[in-house]
Amino acid sequence: MVCPAKWKNLVLFAGSLAFYFYGVRKTPVYLILFLISLLLNWYLGAWMVQAADEKHRKQRLFAGVLFNLCPLMVFKYSGFFTGRGLLLPLGISFYTFQMIGWLVDLYRREIRVFPSFLHFGTWASMWPHMSSGPILRWKDTETDLGARRVTASDVEEGLRELTIGLAMKVLLANQLSGLWQKVGAIGYESISTPFAWLGLIAFTFQIYFDFYGYSLMAVGLGRLLGFHLPENFHYPYMACSMTEFWRRWHMTLGSWFRDYVYIPLGGSRCSRWKLLRNLLVVWLLTGIWHGAGWNFLLWGGCLFVMIAAEKFLYLKILNRYPWLGHLYMMILIPLSWLPFAVAEI
């Protein structure tokens, strides 16, 4: 806030790299991996923009997407097949999707002016969102990167969001997590049905306050730095259907899958069987993005079944009678988190 305007991006970039180094201090080689990712993605973007024709643009986009997915597959999913997981680099799931989105937006010519490496690096490494999102796109911060000024209202709003987010995490999420841990300590086969439901409801609110708290802190910190980061949650537990829920929960992830996977596959403007295929692909990918385990794959499959059933059978009824939708979601939301919460499958 007191830094001269011409130095703001350089100072933020250096500070973000220092933050990343602190986060991976036990395995500092991960900082080198992250720097390589920054450099090569910036170069890949320039390489693709300079392509002579559409065929070469597609080839270079494919190379860029493959380059970004390989480290994610090795670090996050190799343990799924070998049984021996690796320590994850900080934020790799988030910055991998951020980089892929950057390349696709360049390919689609949605980024009109190719940025300097300093602007790109500042955007890609911005420390408030690095560990838990939101997943940024270039358009989210393009204007702020070029010229930003922190006003009194920015400070007020940033501190408010930071405080609320911190309270959600410390006062609510951390306290609720203890109840679900007690369920696991007793053993799922030994607990009573009422206590199992109580534990599951506690987990339902714990994961909300935990993730929303982190996201709100990121938005607040971004505001204090002069950036207007996208909101990630919009009262998801007030949704009347699972379809609506996922438009309100982790919205930057949902919009990423919509724009870069679902719509390119054909979206909903296709035959019924292709629509089912598109939904299955998106929700299985959503599941395994959250973690490398059979429970996450099962969770993604359950979401597919729920949302496909709504689309083909009763979504119009839920939208017509909101009271019925709220009752339906009061039961379905805790049950939908069960495969996510129980890792031993």
Language model features with spans:
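Membrane-embedded transmembrane alpha-helical bundles that form the catalytic cores
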Residues: 1-345
